Amino acid sequence: MVDLVLLNSKMRDSGMTITAIAEKSGISRETLYNKMSGSADFKASEILNLSNTLRLSALERDEIFFAE
């Protein structure tokens, strides 16, 4: 389960718009919105790309995308 509160916080902290984050992560803005609304799951490649775009540490990535 994804910790959307923490993901949103990291996205805000990045100073980038959602559109910029999506583009730098190689996904469409619509796809990112859908995944953040819970209507679709993040693929491993999207998790990796978002982690790189947001400069998340491995611990932060795991806390966000692999929360229990």
Describe each model-derived feature in a short phrase:
Residues 1-17:
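A short, Lys/Arg-rich alpha-helix, primarily the initiator
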